[in-house]
Amino acid sequence: VMETKFEKLEKLISELNISESELAKWFNNRGKDKTGLIPTELPLVYRRGNELTVENGLNLSRKSELWGIQLLSGVMVALTCGSGNNVSETTWGKVKKFAEKMTFNGKPGVLPSKDVLKKHWGNKEEAKFAATVEVLEENEIEADGYRGCIWCSEVYYPDYAYYFSLKNGINDWNLKTDTGDDDRVALAFS
């Protein structure tokens, strides 16, 4: 009689006298490193109030605090495009205000510079971003891919500011009052 793989597993668990709680603990800790994090290619950003912290992986015990992904440049981008828990609408002014009220290691946030974003943008960052999003999705966390328009600190004219497109690596300018579904909240710390 052929045993199924599950029957074999049950037999082994019984032989080794492994309890259900030991098995559950082992199962839940697979793939984690000694810090209890599930490793990700790019660091993840966690938000508690107006304070941001960065960890080199997914901390399932802080899943509700998970805010975003840190790019190679150090710029932090929200998990998803659009408004939401960050800003009521994604105008330049509202995103700038949000950035300024957030802190990281005691420093206040600012809008990122288009030059900093451009310097690190490319296939390497995109591949790391995709791998990071994959880990998040495996753990039932919604995250958009390497896309979105990020408002930059540089102003073009009084009513216009630069934005950077993650999708194609270009920057352009737009009315500060414009919003779009592909706007992505992002901030930097100097």
Residue spans for each PLM region:
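An exposed tryptophan-centered "aromatic clamp" motif
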Residues: 93-109, 114-176, 188-190
